[in-house]
Amino acid sequence: MTASTSVAVGCAVGIPVGVGIIIAVCFWFNLQKRYKREEQDDRELERAIYDESGFVSFDNFGPLRDSKDEAALASSELKNPDHTSGSSEGSAHPEEKDGKSRDQEKPLGKKNSKYYVPAYRRKINLLQVRNNNYGNNARQKSVVDLPSINNSSNVSLSSSQRHITKRQISVYDQMVPVISDEGPKFFADPSSDTNTSNDQNKASMIELKHNTRQSSNENLIRKLQNQDFGSYYPRRASSSFLNGNISNASFHTRNSSITSVNKRDALEDVFATPKSAAQSQLPNTFDKDNEGIDADHSVKDSRSAITDKDKNIYKLQNNYDVGNIGEIAEEDQYENEFTNYSQSKREFIESLRPK
């Protein structure tokens, strides 16, 4: 009874555990195979990446074509019997030659390489093969059209191409140089007439740039002069009794209290309650002809002060004295020597002018 129980427990526990271990070992072997395959693919990809001739190539351009291709073309021309044969071979139909070139193009295009080649590179290779075949066909047609007398010269020319030295072209040899228009011309003849015209064009371009820069500065100065950077508060209607020392530009850009000619001897508190009966401490700068007008204003101010005292009503009109409206030009109460907008504006405009 005990033996059967132990066997049953061992089977119930051991069989699932053994099956699980076997499955885990199978998965581990598959994973190791996958890792090896991926490592091999990575090595091939790195090999293809570091292969300079596989990715960086300008062989489809005539001036930058590799010398190996030229040597291969020369050897194929030597092996081709069309060059050495006479008029009997030259009378062959061109469609047969086109068929041969197509048959040669297919194995070149579909040739499997041990390196990984992207799709765009395959297209470039196909275009390159087609261009080479087209060049071969053109050369063959030109040779066929020549008389048979010149065949010996063609053979000697092709035999001289055997001695072409094969040189391995690196990435630095295949880079296209880019030279800017401005500056010295390294590949130009200094004694040619084109250089003189280029120098004249260059001088005219420099002068044009200088003129455009100067005109743009002048336009900026005009725009800045027409703007008022210090007007943050609404202005009162100007009076006809303004002081003659204040210039007309004060209507557009108000002068600072520091630079003003008419300054108070003792500065008043502008935040105090305005009193219409307060007399101005400014010195009288009007002419003798305006003394009668000042007397009339003083009478009106005294009458208004009496009415304000009788009514005992507070009227907040401005932070300035209402009685001397004809003597005070409106100024920004927050403008001082540190926030002198008009002076800063003038200095900035002067800095823009050409010196």
UniProtKB/Swiss-Prot annotation:
Residues 1-8 are extracellular. The chain crosses the membrane at residues 9-29. It is a single-pass type III membrane protein. The modification Phosphoserine is found at S142. It is found in: Cell membrane; Bud membrane. It comes from the Eukaryota. One of its GO terms (biological process) is cell wall organization. Residues 70-114 are annotated as: Disordered. GO terms for cellular component: cellular bud membrane. The keyword Transmembrane helix applies. Residues 30-355 are cytoplasmic. Residues 92-108 have a biased composition (Basic and acidic residues). The modification Phosphothreonine is found at T273. Belongs to the SKG1 family. Plays a role in cell wall integrity. Affects the cell wall polymer composition in the growing region of the cell. This is Suppressor of lethality of KEX2 GAS1 double null mutant protein 1. The gene is SKG1.
